[in-house]
Swiss-Prot record:
Function: Required for maturation of 30S ribosomal subunits.
Species assigned in the record: Salmonella newport (strain SL254)
NCBIfam families, per database record: PRK00092.1-1
Pfam family, one: RimP_N
Gene behind this protein: rimP
SUPFAM superfamilies attached to this UniProt entry: YhbC-like, C-terminal domain, YhbC-like, N-terminal domain
InterPro entries assigned to the protein according to its UniProt record, in alphabetical order: Ribosome_maturation_RimP, RimP_C, RimP_C_sf, RimP_N, RimP_N_sf
Listed GO biological process terms: ribosomal small subunit assembly; translation
UniProt protein name: Ribosome maturation factor RimP
């Protein structure tokens, strides 16, 4: 289950994981962004990478599931994409997989009067991650992370 997901996002994740995996893809995570027209964003990946046809296949399958289950009570757009270079991080496994990489974090509640942090993922221990920020190790509860993305280097 994703870290810090809303109840709706948890329900949607449970609902669409099997159909996405049945098509041969990994469900990296989802985001539901509320607005005038809300957006359900689904991130998928595979060992061979993701192309537009892959996204279309998943979109078609997920749309069919969502049409039957109808879990979202407002109008929304469905977007399916690869995680990209600035890959979002949703689970403890994601942090462990990208240990040693740079990550940008936005926290729900400030730590040391800061909500935004950037550093190198050093360790994952259960529901806590250690990030080295400017040479100092900082520990964050995964439940306090609102948003996290890898920082691409070119």
């Amino acid at each position: 289950m994703g870290v810090g997901l809303s109840t709706l996002e948890q329900k949607l994740t449970e609902m669409i994981t099997a159909p996405v995996e049945a098509l041969g893809y990994e469900l990296v995570g989802i985001e539901f962004i509320r607005g005038r027209t809300s957006t359900l964003r689904i991130y998928i990946d595979s060992e061979d990478g993701i192309n537009v046809d892959d996204c279309a296949d998943v979109s078609h399958q997920v749309s069919a599931v969502l049409d039957v289950e109808d879990p979202i009570s407002v109008a929304y757009n469905l977007e399916v994409s690869s995680p990209g270079l600035d890959r979002p991080m949703f689970t403890a496994d994601h942090y462990a997989r990208f240990q040693g990489e740079e990550v940008a974090l936005v926290l729900r509640m400030a730590v040391q009067n800061r909500r935004k942090w950037q550093g190198i993922i050093k360790a994952v221990d259960g529901e806590m991650i250690t990030v080295t920020v400017e040479g100092k190790d900082e520990v964050f509860a995964l439940s306090n992370i609102q948003k996290a993305n890898l920082v691409p280097h070119f």
